[in-house]
Amino acid sequence: MGKYFGTDGVRGEANVELTPELAFKLGRFGGYVLSQHETGRPKVFVARDTRISGEMLESALVAGLLSVGIEVYKLGVLATPGVSYLVRTENASAGVMISASHNPALDNGIKFFGGDGFKLDDAREAEIEALLDAAEDTLPRPSAEGLGTLVDYPEGLRKYEKFLVTTGLDLGGMKVALDAANGAAAVSARNIFLDLNAEIAVIGDQPDGLNINAGVGSTHPEQLQALVRESGSAIGLAFDGDSDRLIAVDENGDIVDGDKVMYIIGKYLSQKGELAKNTIVTTVMSNLGFHKALDREGINKAVTAVGDRYVVEEMRKNGYNLGGEQSGHVIIMDYNTTGDGQLTAIQLTKVMVETGKSLSELAAEVTIYPQKLVNIRVENSMKDKAMDVPAIAAIIEKMEAEMAGNGRILVRPSGTEPLLRVMAEAPTDDEVNYYVDTIADVVRAEIGLD
């Protein structure tokens, strides 16, 4: 990660940290870097979610791009994966998404995609950061025909919707409950599932600029659970603010998280011989029950660090086509290059139609183990050295021996804070509490600050 670019672009409180001035510079410097690696005038797609700050930042970003001669196509409100899709299929040089995903309305972010639809590579981000840190802006200032042009491109949304519909099956009147998180999916999810011949009930589709992710969406599925029960829906589908993740709800109103969604889609692809290398890419935070279910099906796993960027890196490196996270980021590389909540939702309903099984039946094959996570404050200098402390290493070894393979312990440093995270999974709540609390007590005694 750089000074400005984190794992998911540049983020911060809108108009405080992520200011119009910074957005202008990101557009200007980002556009210039793109132009240095292109022949001809670069073409860039720009989209945003529904945050009140989106239009402010969009205006500044677009002005910056135009100031260095970029041809800008303004997509309006669109899901992050929609930008990725359009960049690839319409031969754009890059795409920019203005969103802070599942964060509250006061935050926003700016994320660049390369012409291949993947996140802009680290080398390009470093070039942009170097310009941001320069003492003065010495870039060319073209005039007249050298300036960029702006094209409003609302048809991009419908092209993305049509693409998504082609990946699904006729749902034959299936009752589907949707939660668009008052975000980007509010402009598309309804249309997509109506085109798939679903009978729909919708919440979270009235964005006002301030209510994105507020009590709705994939991080707050409670309203959707109630809607599924009240409406008698066969499935509930909750997206986040930029629709790059999905949390599902079965017909009983129970949560079906990213692990279960990946298992259901992965098993379906495996049985059809379409799961690349018969492998699913997941992170160290995936539940042990998910791993055991894959083992029963003979499906392989590739495990990465936490973060969808690491999942995507592993998929690209080894040619895998399915991966994701427990949080609902699911990447189906046969169709798109990034997590896509609406695409994942369509594939989930496709499995239901083709198997004739309810979502609860499909999800029941994964027994989710109780999981507990405790954060312990430590010195930054110690969080990467915890396993070098003999007492900590010994207690972890002792607890793992007691588990005898029927549980899991993960002790890892936070990537951004002076914290050590202690996580365990076991068959019962009592067991998981015992394992985590025992290890946490030793960690606190040896290196804890509290």
Swiss-Prot record:
Catalytic residues (positions): 101
Enzyme Commission number(s): 5.4.2.10
Gene Ontology cellular component terms for the protein in this record: cytosol
GO process terms (BP): carbohydrate metabolic process; peptidoglycan biosynthetic process; UDP-N-acetylglucosamine biosynthetic process
GO molecular function: magnesium ion binding; phosphoglucosamine mutase activity; phosphomannomutase activity
Keyword hit for Metal-binding: yes
Disulfide links within the chain: none
Cofactor note: Binds 1 Mg(2+) ion per subunit.
UniProt entry tagged with the keyword Isomerase: yes
Residues annotated as binding Mg(2+): 101, 240, 242, 244
Modification after translation: Activated by phosphorylation.
Modified residues (Phosphoserine): 101
Domain of life (superkingdom): Bacteria
Family classification: Belongs to the phosphohexose mutase family.
Protein name listed in UniProt: Phosphoglucosamine mutase
Originating species: Streptococcus thermophilus (strain ATCC BAA-250 / LMG 18311)
Gene field: glmM
